[in-house]
Amino acid sequence: MSDLYTIDPMLAKDAHIDRAHYKTLYHESIEQPEAFWNKVSQRLEWFKAPTKIKNVSYQLEDVHIRWFEDGELNASVNCLDRHLTLRGDKTALLFEPDAPDAPSSRITYRELYERVCQLGNALRHLGIEKGDRVTIYLPMIPDAVVAILACARIGAIHSVVFGGFAANSIADRVNDCGSKLIITADEGLRGGRKIPLKANVDAALKIHGTQSVETVLVVRHTGSTINMHTPRDRWFHDLVDIQATECAPERMNAEDSLFILYTSGSTGKPKGVLHTTGGYLVYTSYTHETVFDLRENDIYWCTADIGWITGHSYIVYGPLANGTTVLLFEGTPHYPTVSRFWEVIDKHHVTLFYTAPTAIRALMREGDTPVKKTSRKSLRLLGSVGEPINPEAWHWYYTIVGNGRCPIVDTWWQTETGGILITPLIGATDLKPGSVTLPFFGIRPALVDTNGQTLDGPAAGNLVLLDSWPGQMRTLYGDHQRFIDTYFRTYPNTYFTGDGCRRDADGYYWITGRVDDVINISGHRIGTAEIESTLVAHPKVAEAAVVGFPHPIKGQGIYAYVTLITGETPSEALHQELLTWVRKEIGAIAIPDHVQWASNLPKTRSGKIMRRILRKIAENAPDQLGDTSTLADPSIVDLLLNERLKH
């Protein structure tokens, strides 16, 4: 297997940005950031063009981040109105339902505009004003996009809660931001199962602290019988269908709040990441066009849920601001068969495909046949997002899914960053499997040691960012001090990402996992991601998760949870084979002290492995597991506890 995939000259010739252009623009973006971002901001339509481009301080006594602060615009106008003249009849949303035999549907930019205006008018009729918070708890259906853009149109701040979260999670988020209104559906559909969304909202609103909610709008999706509580609950369609199809957009200052999105897995009080209007929209639209080398006739599919930042930035705001045709998929990669993703790609002639390593590894586990039953000839670019992709999965994605002809953009970014920060550009960057490669324009990454000393050249350390970019979060909602303490206090005058990272001799960046996913063995620091990648590279291993546990001699030991590919069974011989494999690939220091076979791993509904829970199982501390309600399948925890090895 090659560890370097050089730029395809034909791709570079047609790409938006080639290598020379990247170097020129990157230099300009670092040396003259205000001039650079002023020019980029002109891609949007402003009521009042900004003249004050950047006003940022990372000083602990005065952390503030403001971009385009005297500009005025509206996000929904940029995603809808400005496309009506030339793209009014172009498909904005291609909706593919959960069930493959259910009809898919198309919504044009004009139809989406009219529906957003109708909901905007309905929200105003219900007393929602600029600055009010609206919670959106919907499945992956077109009305979720409508709800987001309708809030943006009237200046309401949306807080989307992932449709897999239960009542307590909804209540926490409603309570924290003081929502006046919730938009939900009778039920969701996912993998052939019904999700009781309205019932979850009802349960949430019985929890103390949710009394700010005055109205619940309910989309009739499955048609099942549900409880409606009058006068609080209203049917969405009854109210929205009668509204006018024109709705005057609110003039928003660039620094007016656009949305709050709560980070998953945080302990205690939820962390409400706040993004504002101008900088976020400039950054998401620019990164979407540039990273995906966007063309007018592309069919773009990001498989994330709208409840996560990837859905906000790269299903809704970035793509629609660019006038893209976006595929919206309600289902799962495994329903009704493991060929579903590839069948949907063929059905809708998808050209750009953006998914998570978790999905790639899960489908790789099923073998090549389900993929090869389909053609996927429409694809021209593949993307990866959400966590580091191990080289083995990268190669499979490239060779099998992309037929060895589609470059992969392995993108690194966070809820807090708003958009992609480190990524290849297909016409400018040679690819290394497992590396997120080089920084995007305006991004100044650096590596520091635990004392905050900058590490030059090839090195491994903590990833920090030395300067701001327009898409950066502005604060944590209602808790600016926590924002400062979380992101700026650890290494003063920098933004601390919380991620460990390695930089190689070519200046390429390799994300090694969260800093708390580093194991210190006898004074040697080793990233769990490196051990995991090595285990997954073994031909019989589908997935692996590695955590540290207290060791009486070494300080920390290595505990590995291993899921085998379909058809393989655990054995002592295979156990020894894996230990030998790790010794050969990394060295004796990385050999796991314990290997536990796991039929599945505990994951959040967004697909992230909950290593916090795996650590507690490894430590034999079941009473310290904490909240497991965000897991897709909490029963896995009991299974792992029961099978836990004694040590």
Swiss-Prot record:
The keyword Acetylation applies. CoA binds at R190, G191, G192, R193, T310, S522, R583. Keywords: Acetylation, ATP-binding, Ligase, Magnesium, Metal-binding, Nucleotide-binding. It catalyses: acetate + ATP + CoA = acetyl-CoA + AMP + diphosphate. ATP binds at G386, E387, P388, D410, T411, W412, W413, Q414, T415, D499, R514, R525. GO terms for biological process: acetyl-CoA biosynthetic process from acetate. It comes from the Bacteria. One of its GO terms (cellular component) is cytosol. The modification N6-acetyllysine is found at K608. Its cofactor is Mg(2+). Acetylated. Deacetylation by the SIR2-homolog deacetylase activates the enzyme. Its EC number is 6.2.1.1. It is an enzyme of class 6 (ligase). Belongs to the ATP-dependent AMP-binding enzyme family. HAMAP family: Ac_CoA_synth. Catalyzes the conversion of acetate into acetyl-CoA (AcCoA), an essential intermediate at the junction of anabolic and catabolic pathways. AcsA undergoes a two-step reaction. In the first half reaction, AcsA combines acetate with ATP to form acetyl-adenylate (AcAMP) intermediate. In the second half reaction, it can then transfer the acetyl group from AcAMP to the sulfhydryl group of CoA, forming the product AcCoA. This is Acetyl-coenzyme A synthetase. The gene is acsA.
